[in-house]
Amino acid sequence: MKEDRRSAPLFPIGIVMDLTQLSARQIRYYEEHNLVSPTRTKGNRRLFSFNDVDKLLEIKDLLDQGLNMAGIKQVLLMKENQTEAVKVKEETKEISKTELRKILRDELQHTGRFNRTSLRQGDISRFFH
């Protein structure tokens, strides 16, 4: 499921309670601690996304493992940072300015001037002439 679909607000708190086996008070408590951020309707009702439900289930699992709120916050923060690092790494696959300068410098050294053909072009051109 795409990320934009997973973050769409769909579920009222009653459905989330059934899905997670958490009480409304527990869910509101996690919201107060900024662990989940449900969207509010015009009538001020909470609507939770798939991501919110996943996070609540993860919180429940961490509680079952014996972690307290501070530990849960650390685990979720580390997981979020790791996810962001992966996204940043994927986005920065482009060539850096330093690498680009090095490639251009090498190319200019091979050609000597802008008007001459590079050695690479010369090597390739012999196959076509």
UniProtKB/Swiss-Prot annotation:
<dbReference type="InterPro" id="IPR047057">
    <property type="entry name" value="MerR_fam"/>
</dbReference>
<dbReference type="GO" id="GO:0045892">
    <property type="term" value="P:negative regulation of DNA-templated transcription"/>
</dbReference>
<dbReference type="InterPro" id="IPR000551">
    <property type="entry name" value="MerR-type_HTH_dom"/>
</dbReference>
<dbReference type="GO" id="GO:0003700">
    <property type="term" value="F:DNA-binding transcription factor activity"/>
</dbReference>
<dbReference type="InterPro" id="IPR009061">
    <property type="entry name" value="DNA-bd_dom_put_sf"/>
</dbReference>
<comment type="function">
    <text>Transcription repressor during nitrogen excess. On the contrary of the MerR members, which require longer DNA sites for high-affinity binding, GlnR requires a DNA sequence of 17 nucleotides as minimal binding site.</text>
</comment>
<dbReference type="Pfam" id="PF13411">
    <property type="entry name" value="MerR_1"/>
</dbReference>
<feature type="DNA-binding region" description="H-T-H motif">
    <location>
        <begin position="13"/>
        <end position="32"/>
    </location>
</feature>
<feature type="domain" description="HTH merR-type">
    <location>
        <begin position="10"/>
        <end position="78"/>
    </location>
</feature>
<protein>
    <recommendedName>
        <fullName>HTH-type transcriptional regulator GlnR</fullName>
    </recommendedName>
</protein>
<keyword id="KW-0804">Transcription</keyword>
<dbReference type="GO" id="GO:0003677">
    <property type="term" value="F:DNA binding"/>
</dbReference>
<comment type="subunit">
    <text>Homodimer under conditions of nitrogen excess. Monomer under conditions of nitrogen-limited. Interacts with feedback-inhibited GlnA in order to stabilizes GlnR-DNA complex.</text>
</comment>
<keyword id="KW-0238">DNA-binding</keyword>
<keyword id="KW-0678">Repressor</keyword>
<keyword id="KW-0805">Transcription regulation</keyword>
